[in-house]
């Protein structure tokens, strides 16, 4: 086990998040080539489609992330005669059902998304009937501090959801950027202070939990 006391309960950098999301996606969409070789995983991480933001990672960066995640039981190396391959173990480490794993994977790859975006983008990964099913699974993830609900900003029509496994500072940056974006679209409108306070309280709780794990 690494610096965190419990597998999967740590906070991860953007490269580790991209690695996990790519493994989850390819497990569902390319089962014939999964688990992935390091080279295939680098290509998956650097895809120019279905990735926000687009990244340009090296084999060294991806390999380092894999080793860090392996230390927390979130990835596993399968040694082969022709090539070593990597698989994700997020579902086992975090005790996720398939629907939750897919949603976490989508949020790992594309950040904050609306219910309708998650429904559309999950069509090759899982068979959700409607947005209500997605919202139900997201609420279960939120109750475990694995996901965040981001109330819609001024000029937006829908709330958004994102994972809560990134660095707390990065999560705060997402919230700040969304608030600024909303203000730019409608300078006369302001975000509900109660909603902001609720999000700030959740961030504080996440930071406190991280401090306990690192202690």
From Swiss-Prot:
SUPFAM superfamilies: Winged helix' DNA-binding domain
Family the entry assigns: Belongs to the UPF0502 family.
Highest rank taxon of the organism: Bacteria
PANTHER family per the UniProt record, alphabetical: UPF0502 PROTEIN YCEH (PTHR38768:SF1)
Protein known as: UPF0502 protein PputGB1_3531
Organism in which the protein naturally occurs: Pseudomonas putida (strain GB-1)
């Amino acid at each position: 086990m690494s610096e965190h006391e419990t597998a999967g309960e740590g906070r991860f950098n953007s490269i580790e998040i991209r690695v996990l999301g790519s493994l989850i996606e390819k497990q569902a969409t390319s089962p014939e080539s999964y688990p992935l070789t390091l080279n295939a995983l680098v290509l998956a991480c650097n895809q120019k489609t279905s990735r926000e933001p687009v990244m340009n990672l090296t084999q060294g960066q991806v390999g380092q992330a894999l080793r860090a995640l392996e230390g927390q039981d979130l990835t596993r190396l399968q040694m082969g005669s022709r090539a070593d391959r990597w698989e994700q173990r997020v579902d086992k480490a975090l005790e996720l059902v398939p629907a939750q794993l897919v949603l976490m994977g989508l949020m790992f790859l594309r950040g904050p998304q609306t219910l309708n975006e998650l429904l559309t983008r999950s069509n090759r990964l899982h068979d959700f009937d409607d947005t209500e099913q997605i919202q139900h699974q997201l609420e279960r993830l939120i109750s475990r501090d694995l996901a965040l609900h981001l109330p819609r900003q001024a000029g937006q029509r829908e709330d958004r959801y994102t994972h809560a496994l990134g660095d707390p500072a990065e999560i705060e940056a997402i919230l700040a950027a969304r608030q600024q974006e909303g203000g730019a679209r409608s300078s006369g409108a302001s975000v509900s202070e109660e909603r902001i306070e609720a999000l700030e309280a959740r961030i504080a709780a996440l930071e406190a939990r991280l401090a306990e794990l690192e202690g």
